[in-house]
Swiss-Prot record:
Encoding gene, per UniProt annotation: truA
Organism: Methylobacterium sp. (strain 4-46)
UniProt record, GO biological process: tRNA pseudouridine synthesis
Any one Gene Ontology molecular-function term assigned to this protein's record: tRNA pseudouridine(38-40) synthase activity
Function: Formation of pseudouridine at positions 38, 39 and 40 in the anticodon stem and loop of transfer RNAs.
HAMAP family, per the entry: TruA
EC number: 5.4.99.12
Protein name: tRNA pseudouridine synthase A
Matches recorded under CDD domains: PseudoU_synth_EcTruA
Residues engaged in binding substrate: 111
Assembly with partners or alone: Homodimer.
Amino acid sequence: MPRYKLVVEYDGSGFAGWQRQAADRTVQQALEEAIARFAGAPVRVHCAGRTDAGVHATHQVVHLDLDRDWRTDTVRDASNAHLRPEPVAVVSAERVRPDFDARHSALRRHYRYRILNRRSPPALGRAYLWHVPWSLDAHAMHAAAQTLLGRHDFSAFRAAECQANSPVRTLDQLDVARIGDEILVATSARSFLHHQVRGMVGTLMLAGCGRLDAAGVRAVLDSRDRTRCGPLAPAAGLTLTGVDYPEPGP
């Protein structure tokens, strides 16, 4: 069976996350149903990162097997035709080797978190950011973020229901920068724990308002205690923006 790699974009606001559930609408369900309509048979799609309810993606990657050889532009366009009016779009489709796996072949995942840092609430785009009305120091947040880089036990930022076998992860990037009224947090790692990014952002917010310094943020990490973590940043501000893979061989 030919295998396809899709890049998928979605607004996670109205979904109960990526993974198919018995009762609630999910991104996986919407995509599988759309592809099955044109392919004429049930399909199963496998993603690079299972986003939570309310989390968005501009570059989610999935793989799937179809029972016949379809043109890649047909896979893309037919999927999008059947996805309407869902806020999900297939950006691109390509044929890949049978051993390509959207999750296990990934080298790195990239996320962005948006904070609107001004007194006035947003009139537009509130489903895509966290409004923090008190003043935040982005430089202090960035300095604190650097103490989290590297290979560590991230239990302090891990959800209680996280099913990962190990809390140890290697954080490759955690940058914080202000652009006008927005503070953007960019982070990259091979993989993240459940709620890790949102937990880190909530803790960095405390550094931004002066309640923690860089040493205090590092102390949260070293404690391995979830109760020491800052507030869990809302899902709305988080977007999966990219997934890296090895260059295909000859």
